[in-house]
A protein has these predicted regions:
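Charged substrate- and nucleic-acid-binding regions of tRNA-handling and nucleotidyl-transfer enzymes
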Residues: 27-33, 88-178
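Conserved, hydrophobic alpha-helical core segments of structured domains
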Residues: 1-85, 91-94, 177
Length: 178
C-alpha cells in the first residue's frame, strides 16, 4: 500500500500516511485471488491493518491489545512491526526495537501469569450477576464493565471486589430511571 499512499512534504521527506489500510485492502483482494482460506486471509488482513498501530509499552496497553487479539497474533504483530522498523530510516531504530522487545516481554508475562483478559477469565460470571438482580443484556454489559475494570487496573479480579465495582459503576437502564 505504500506506493499508492506516497507523498512528499515541503522538506522533500517522503511519507506514507495510512498505508496500512490501503495495504490491507490490496492484500484482501490478492488473498481472494490466491484462494487462501478465509481464516488465514482474515488473520493476514488484520496483521496488515494493525501493523502501524503503536501500542504503548505498558502492561495495561498490552493487556488491552491481547484482549482484542490472541497471544499468537500479538507475537506475529510484533514481528511485522520489527520488520517494518528495519524497513524505515535508522532514526531511533534501536529505541523502537527495544520497545518492541519490551512489549513482547509484557505479553509473555501476561500469558504466563494467566492474567484476566477475557470475560471467561473473570472471577465472576452471569450467575453472580443474576443473583445481584441483573437480567438480560445487563448481564453482558456488567461483565464487560468488570473486564474493562480489571484490564484497566481499576479493580482486582476477585469476586467480591468485582461485585462492588459493578454495583458502583453500572448505569441501569430501568424504565423507572428514564
Amino acid at each position: 500500500g505504500k506506493p499508492r499512499m506516497h507523498t512528499v512534504d515541503e522538506n522533500g521527506i517522503s511519507h506514507f500516511k495510512k498505508h496500512q489500510f490501503q495495504g490491507a485492502y490490496m492484500a484482501e483482494k490478492i488473498l481472494k485471488r490466491l484462494r487462501i482460506d478465509n481464516a488465514s486471509a482474515k488473520y493476514i488482513y488484520e496483521l496488515i491493518w494493525e501493523h502501524d498501530n503503536r501500542i504503548p509499552a505498558t502492561k495495561k496497553s498490552v493487556r488491552r491489545f491481547m484482549a482484542q487479539h490472541d497471544f499468537d497474533f500479538v507475537m506475529d504483530y510484533l514481528e511485522v512491526r520489527r520488520a517494518d522498523t528495519y524497513a524505515q530510516s535508522d532514526y531511533k531504530r534501536q529505541e523502537k526495537l527495544a520497545e518492541l522487545d519490551h512489549i513482547a516481554e509484557l505479553a509473555m508475562e501476561i500469558k504466563e501469569d494467566n492474567e484476566c483478559i477475557h470475560i471467561c477469565d473473570l472471577d465472576i460470571n452471569g450467575k453472580d450477576l443474576l443473583q445481584m438482580g441483573f437480567g438480560g443484556k445487563d448481564i453482558g454489559i456488567g461483565l464487560e464493565l468488570a473486564l474493562n475494570g480489571v484490564i484497566d487496573e481499576k479493580v482486582e479480579n476477585k469476586k467480591e471486589e468485582l461485585k462492588g465495582y459493578i454495583e458502583s459503576n453500572f448505569k441501569r437502564q430501568d424504565k423507572d430511571n428514564t
